[in-house]
Amino acid sequence: KKVYAIKPLTFMNNSGVCIKELIEYFKIDAKNVIVFHDDIDIDLGKIKAKFGGSSAGHNGIESIDKFIGKDYSRVRVGIGKPEEKTKVSNHVLDDFAENEEEKIKDITDNIVKLVPTLINKEMDLFSSKVNQNLNGI
């Protein structure tokens, strides 16, 4: 199988434009697209993967939904909630703290090891194994 790893260089709110152009250029069905994105409702360093669903207010996902529909896979990468609710916009845009970077490195390593599971659309198994490996299991 061919796999393309693509990071749009557009603003997040315009992610859908880029994704639509890429799936048209490479002739990829939206059902074969996997989008990774941050999620403040998931603890830092944990993930949840699923096919389809709502944007849950994520502007980048809303843009993608608008341009290619909702029938694609998503991997929601937890960044946790800010200590003060009023600082959500800063939280999602700030760099990770030094102690958080280690968690991000660990989850990235686990994701890379489990890419074949993700490509086979075993979303629950992928989520479970990535998160298990983070707990030292």
Question: What does each of the following model-derived ranges do?
Answer:
Residues 1-52, 62-75, 82-87, 94, ...:
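Nucleotide and nucleotide-moiety/phosphate-recognizing core
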Residues 59:
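Hydrophobic secondary-structure segments that place a key small or acidic residue at a functional site
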Residues 55:
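Conserved TIR/SEFIR loop-to-helix hotspot centered on a Trp-containing motif
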